[in-house]
Amino acid sequence: MTDRWQLPGQARADRLVVSISDIEMGAGGVLDDFPHASFLGDLLRRYAAPPFDRLAVDLVFNGDTFDLLKTSIDGAYPIRITADVAVAKMQRIIQAHSAFFDALNDILDVGRRRVFFVIGNHDPELVFPEVQALLRARIRHDHEVYFPGFAMSVGDALIEHGSQADPMFRVPPQQPFLAHRGERLLALPWGAVALLEAAMPLQRDLFWADRLKPRKLVFELLPELREVLVNAFWTYWTRDYVRGLLERDPVKQVNWTLFREVVYRFGSQDPDMSMGDIHHRRLQKSDRWRVRTIGHHHQAQWWSY
Protein backbone atom coordinates (compact mmCIF):
# COMPACT_ATOMS: atom_id res chain seq x y z
CA MET A 1 0.00 0.00 0.00
CA THR A 2 1.33 3.41 -0.93
CA ASP A 3 1.71 5.94 1.84
CA ARG A 4 -0.71 8.68 0.84
CA TRP A 5 1.55 11.23 2.52
CA GLN A 6 4.56 10.26 0.41
CA LEU A 7 5.74 12.99 -1.95
CA PRO A 8 7.09 12.10 -5.42
CA GLY A 9 10.87 12.11 -5.16
CA GLN A 10 10.76 12.61 -1.40
CA ALA A 11 13.20 9.77 -0.73
CA ARG A 12 15.88 11.72 -2.61
CA ALA A 13 14.90 15.22 -1.51
CA ASP A 14 16.49 16.99 1.43
CA ARG A 15 14.66 20.30 1.10
CA LEU A 16 11.41 21.66 -0.31
CA VAL A 17 11.52 25.15 -1.83
CA VAL A 18 8.19 26.98 -2.11
CA SER A 19 8.28 30.16 -4.20
CA ILE A 20 5.38 32.63 -4.10
CA SER A 21 5.48 35.97 -5.89
CA ASP A 22 3.39 39.11 -6.34
CA ILE A 23 1.11 38.82 -3.32
CA GLU A 24 1.09 42.63 -3.06
CA MET A 25 -0.54 42.91 0.35
CA GLY A 26 -1.25 46.54 1.17
CA ALA A 27 -2.44 48.61 4.08
CA GLY A 28 -5.97 47.22 4.29
CA GLY A 29 -9.26 48.68 3.18
CA VAL A 30 -10.79 48.91 -0.27
CA LEU A 31 -7.49 49.95 -1.87
CA ASP A 32 -5.69 46.81 -0.72
CA ASP A 33 -5.34 44.29 -3.56
CA PHE A 34 -4.88 41.35 -1.16
CA PRO A 35 -7.60 40.92 1.48
CA HIS A 36 -6.81 37.21 1.92
CA ALA A 37 -4.16 37.12 4.65
CA SER A 38 -6.04 34.49 6.68
CA PHE A 39 -6.37 32.18 3.68
CA LEU A 40 -2.69 32.57 2.85
CA GLY A 41 -1.74 31.92 6.46
CA ASP A 42 -3.74 28.67 6.50
CA LEU A 43 -2.14 27.61 3.22
CA LEU A 44 1.37 28.25 4.51
CA ARG A 45 0.75 26.31 7.72
CA ARG A 46 0.25 23.17 5.64
CA TYR A 47 4.00 23.16 5.01
CA ALA A 48 4.47 22.34 8.69
CA ALA A 49 2.18 19.29 8.43
CA PRO A 50 2.44 15.90 6.65
CA PRO A 51 3.79 15.11 4.15
CA PHE A 52 6.05 18.18 4.32
CA ASP A 53 7.02 17.74 7.97
CA ARG A 54 9.67 15.21 6.92
CA LEU A 55 11.54 17.80 4.88
CA ALA A 56 13.33 21.05 5.52
CA VAL A 57 11.25 23.80 3.91
CA ASP A 58 12.27 27.16 2.46
CA LEU A 59 9.43 29.65 1.94
CA VAL A 60 10.62 32.14 -0.66
CA PHE A 61 8.47 35.22 -1.14
CA ASN A 62 9.73 36.18 -4.57
CA GLY A 63 9.20 39.93 -4.68
CA ASP A 64 6.19 42.24 -4.42
CA THR A 65 5.12 40.45 -1.27
CA PHE A 66 4.23 43.85 0.15
CA ASP A 67 2.66 46.64 -1.88
CA LEU A 68 4.74 49.38 -0.29
CA LEU A 69 4.70 51.24 -3.60
CA LYS A 70 0.96 51.90 -3.25
CA THR A 71 0.94 52.41 0.53
CA SER A 72 0.36 56.02 1.49
CA ILE A 73 1.64 58.00 4.45
CA ASP A 74 -0.76 60.62 5.81
CA GLY A 75 -2.69 60.39 2.55
CA ALA A 76 0.35 61.16 0.40
CA TYR A 77 2.76 59.15 -1.75
CA PRO A 78 6.22 60.63 -1.20
CA ILE A 79 9.01 59.95 -3.68
CA ARG A 80 11.74 60.87 -1.20
CA ILE A 81 11.65 57.73 0.89
CA THR A 82 13.78 57.72 4.03
CA ALA A 83 14.10 54.88 6.51
CA ASP A 84 11.41 56.50 8.68
CA VAL A 85 8.98 56.67 5.75
CA ALA A 86 9.73 53.07 4.77
CA VAL A 87 9.19 51.82 8.32
CA ALA A 88 5.91 53.75 8.63
CA LYS A 89 4.65 52.13 5.42
CA MET A 90 5.66 48.67 6.58
CA GLN A 91 3.96 49.17 9.93
CA ARG A 92 0.66 49.89 8.17
CA ILE A 93 0.90 46.63 6.23
CA ILE A 94 1.87 44.62 9.31
CA GLN A 95 -1.17 45.97 11.17
CA ALA A 96 -3.48 45.07 8.26
CA HIS A 97 -2.19 41.51 7.77
CA SER A 98 -1.44 40.08 11.20
CA ALA A 99 -2.73 36.65 10.12
CA PHE A 100 0.10 36.34 7.59
CA PHE A 101 2.82 37.19 10.08
CA ASP A 102 1.31 34.96 12.77
CA ALA A 103 1.40 32.07 10.30
CA LEU A 104 5.08 32.64 9.54
CA ASN A 105 5.86 32.63 13.25
CA ASP A 106 3.96 29.35 13.71
CA ILE A 107 5.74 27.71 10.77
CA LEU A 108 9.19 28.73 11.97
CA ASP A 109 8.38 27.41 15.45
CA VAL A 110 8.31 23.91 13.93
CA GLY A 111 12.00 24.02 13.07
CA ARG A 112 13.90 23.27 9.84
CA ARG A 113 12.06 26.12 8.13
CA ARG A 114 13.41 29.33 6.65
CA VAL A 115 11.72 32.41 5.20
CA PHE A 116 13.21 34.57 2.45
CA PHE A 117 11.98 37.92 1.16
CA VAL A 118 13.29 38.72 -2.33
CA ILE A 119 12.96 42.39 -3.32
CA GLY A 120 10.49 43.38 -6.05
CA ASN A 121 9.47 46.65 -7.64
CA HIS A 122 6.51 47.07 -5.26
CA ASP A 123 8.58 46.55 -2.11
CA PRO A 124 12.01 48.13 -2.74
CA GLU A 125 11.89 49.49 0.82
CA LEU A 126 13.05 46.03 1.90
CA VAL A 127 16.61 47.22 1.22
CA PHE A 128 16.44 49.34 4.39
CA PRO A 129 18.00 47.50 7.36
CA GLU A 130 15.39 49.22 9.54
CA VAL A 131 12.55 47.58 7.60
CA GLN A 132 14.27 44.21 7.76
CA ALA A 133 14.65 44.55 11.54
CA LEU A 134 10.95 45.44 11.85
CA LEU A 135 9.90 42.32 9.94
CA ARG A 136 12.21 40.05 11.90
CA ALA A 137 10.84 41.45 15.15
CA ARG A 138 7.23 40.90 14.03
CA ILE A 139 7.86 37.34 12.86
CA ARG A 140 9.89 36.71 16.04
CA HIS A 141 12.53 34.53 14.41
CA ASP A 142 15.63 36.63 13.79
CA HIS A 143 17.84 33.81 12.55
CA GLU A 144 15.38 32.15 10.17
CA VAL A 145 14.29 35.26 8.20
CA TYR A 146 16.52 36.32 5.31
CA PHE A 147 16.69 39.18 2.83
CA PRO A 148 18.83 37.96 -0.10
CA GLY A 149 18.31 41.02 -2.32
CA PHE A 150 16.87 40.94 -5.84
CA ALA A 151 17.54 37.22 -6.43
CA MET A 152 18.66 34.09 -4.63
CA SER A 153 19.72 30.56 -5.42
CA VAL A 154 19.08 27.22 -3.77
CA GLY A 155 21.24 24.51 -5.28
CA ASP A 156 20.82 24.74 -9.04
CA ALA A 157 17.60 26.79 -8.84
CA LEU A 158 17.62 30.57 -9.34
CA ILE A 159 14.74 32.58 -7.92
CA GLU A 160 14.36 36.21 -9.02
CA HIS A 161 11.45 38.59 -9.04
CA GLY A 162 12.13 39.72 -12.60
CA SER A 163 11.76 43.49 -12.30
CA GLN A 164 15.52 43.90 -12.67
CA ALA A 165 15.03 42.98 -16.34
CA ASP A 166 12.41 45.72 -16.70
CA PRO A 167 14.02 49.09 -17.59
CA MET A 168 11.19 50.90 -15.82
CA PHE A 169 12.00 49.35 -12.46
CA ARG A 170 15.63 48.28 -12.47
CA VAL A 171 17.60 49.34 -9.38
CA PRO A 172 21.43 49.24 -9.23
CA PRO A 173 21.89 46.38 -6.72
CA GLN A 174 25.08 47.89 -5.32
CA GLN A 175 23.63 51.42 -5.05
CA PRO A 176 20.06 51.20 -3.74
CA PHE A 177 20.35 54.51 -1.86
CA LEU A 178 20.95 58.17 -2.66
CA ALA A 179 22.55 60.74 -0.39
CA HIS A 180 20.79 64.11 -0.36
CA ARG A 181 21.34 66.89 2.15
CA GLY A 182 22.49 64.50 4.81
CA GLU A 183 19.64 62.05 4.30
CA ARG A 184 19.70 58.52 2.93
CA LEU A 185 16.97 58.16 0.31
CA LEU A 186 15.74 55.12 -1.57
CA ALA A 187 17.00 55.24 -5.17
CA LEU A 188 13.61 54.79 -6.77
CA PRO A 189 13.66 53.77 -10.46
CA TRP A 190 12.01 56.22 -12.82
CA GLY A 191 9.03 53.92 -13.42
CA ALA A 192 8.20 53.89 -9.72
CA VAL A 193 8.57 57.67 -9.49
CA ALA A 194 6.15 58.10 -12.40
CA LEU A 195 3.57 55.79 -10.84
CA LEU A 196 3.76 57.58 -7.50
CA GLU A 197 3.35 61.03 -9.00
CA ALA A 198 1.04 60.40 -11.97
CA ALA A 199 -0.98 57.26 -11.20
CA MET A 200 -1.36 57.17 -7.44
CA PRO A 201 -3.35 60.44 -7.25
CA LEU A 202 -5.96 58.57 -9.35
CA GLN A 203 -6.01 55.46 -7.16
CA ARG A 204 -8.97 56.43 -5.02
CA ASP A 205 -11.19 56.66 -8.12
CA LEU A 206 -9.64 54.03 -10.39
CA PHE A 207 -8.35 51.29 -8.06
CA TRP A 208 -10.90 48.86 -9.52
CA ALA A 209 -9.48 49.25 -13.02
CA ASP A 210 -6.06 47.96 -11.97
CA ARG A 211 -7.67 44.61 -11.13
CA LEU A 212 -9.21 44.05 -14.57
CA LYS A 213 -7.42 41.80 -17.07
CA PRO A 214 -6.43 41.52 -19.85
CA ARG A 215 -5.36 45.15 -19.98
CA LYS A 216 -5.65 45.43 -23.76
CA LEU A 217 -9.29 44.33 -23.74
CA VAL A 218 -10.09 46.63 -20.81
CA PHE A 219 -8.86 49.63 -22.79
CA GLU A 220 -10.80 48.53 -25.86
CA LEU A 221 -14.02 48.32 -23.86
CA LEU A 222 -13.32 51.42 -21.77
CA PRO A 223 -11.62 53.94 -24.08
CA GLU A 224 -12.38 56.70 -21.58
CA LEU A 225 -10.16 54.96 -19.04
CA ARG A 226 -7.31 54.83 -21.53
CA GLU A 227 -7.78 58.52 -22.29
CA VAL A 228 -7.66 59.49 -18.61
CA LEU A 229 -4.44 57.56 -18.04
CA VAL A 230 -2.73 58.69 -21.23
CA ASN A 231 -3.56 62.33 -20.48
CA ALA A 232 -2.30 62.01 -16.90
CA PHE A 233 1.02 60.54 -17.98
CA TRP A 234 1.40 62.93 -20.91
CA THR A 235 1.06 65.87 -18.56
CA TYR A 236 3.46 64.25 -16.15
CA TRP A 237 6.25 63.50 -18.65
CA THR A 238 5.99 66.76 -20.58
CA ARG A 239 5.60 69.09 -17.60
CA ASP A 240 5.97 67.71 -14.08
CA TYR A 241 8.95 65.42 -14.65
CA VAL A 242 10.80 68.10 -16.60
CA ARG A 243 10.14 70.56 -13.79
CA GLY A 244 11.67 68.12 -11.33
CA LEU A 245 14.76 67.74 -13.49
CA LEU A 246 15.21 71.51 -13.69
CA GLU A 247 14.83 71.75 -9.93
CA ARG A 248 17.47 68.99 -9.53
CA ASP A 249 15.20 66.61 -7.69
CA PRO A 250 17.60 63.86 -6.50
CA VAL A 251 15.28 60.95 -7.33
CA LYS A 252 14.62 62.07 -10.90
CA GLN A 253 16.95 61.18 -13.73
CA VAL A 254 16.99 61.19 -17.50
CA ASN A 255 18.71 58.73 -19.81
CA TRP A 256 18.23 57.07 -23.16
CA THR A 257 16.38 54.08 -21.69
CA LEU A 258 13.82 56.35 -20.06
CA PHE A 259 13.32 58.35 -23.26
CA ARG A 260 12.97 55.22 -25.40
CA GLU A 261 10.44 53.58 -23.10
CA VAL A 262 8.30 56.69 -22.75
CA VAL A 263 8.21 57.19 -26.52
CA TYR A 264 7.29 53.53 -27.06
CA ARG A 265 4.50 53.52 -24.50
CA PHE A 266 2.89 56.66 -25.84
CA GLY A 267 3.33 55.55 -29.44
CA SER A 268 1.80 52.13 -28.84
CA GLN A 269 -0.47 53.23 -25.99
CA ASP A 270 0.68 50.02 -24.33
CA PRO A 271 1.32 50.52 -20.59
CA ASP A 272 2.80 47.06 -20.15
CA MET A 273 6.05 45.54 -21.31
CA SER A 274 6.58 41.93 -22.33
CA MET A 275 9.88 40.69 -20.97
CA GLY A 276 9.48 37.15 -22.20
CA ASP A 277 12.15 37.56 -24.86
CA ILE A 278 14.68 38.75 -22.28
CA HIS A 279 14.21 35.69 -20.10
CA HIS A 280 14.12 33.34 -23.09
CA ARG A 281 17.53 34.62 -24.16
CA ARG A 282 18.91 34.16 -20.66
CA LEU A 283 17.68 30.58 -20.54
CA GLN A 284 19.22 29.80 -23.93
CA LYS A 285 22.50 31.56 -23.19
CA SER A 286 23.39 29.73 -19.99
CA ASP A 287 22.71 26.30 -18.53
CA ARG A 288 24.02 27.27 -15.10
CA TRP A 289 20.53 26.92 -13.60
CA ARG A 290 18.30 23.90 -14.09
CA VAL A 291 15.34 25.88 -12.81
CA ARG A 292 14.67 29.62 -12.94
CA THR A 293 11.61 30.99 -11.17
CA ILE A 294 10.47 34.47 -12.21
CA GLY A 295 7.63 36.66 -10.94
CA HIS A 296 6.64 40.21 -11.94
CA HIS A 297 4.61 39.22 -15.03
CA HIS A 298 1.35 38.28 -13.29
CA GLN A 299 0.91 35.63 -15.99
CA ALA A 300 1.46 31.89 -15.59
CA GLN A 301 4.03 30.61 -18.08
CA TRP A 302 6.28 27.57 -18.39
CA TRP A 303 9.38 27.43 -20.59
CA SER A 304 11.77 24.54 -21.03
CA TYR A 305 14.76 23.82 -23.26
Language-model-detected regions and their locations in the chain:
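Extended recognition/assembly regions associated with phosphoester-bond processing machinery
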Residues: M1-Y305
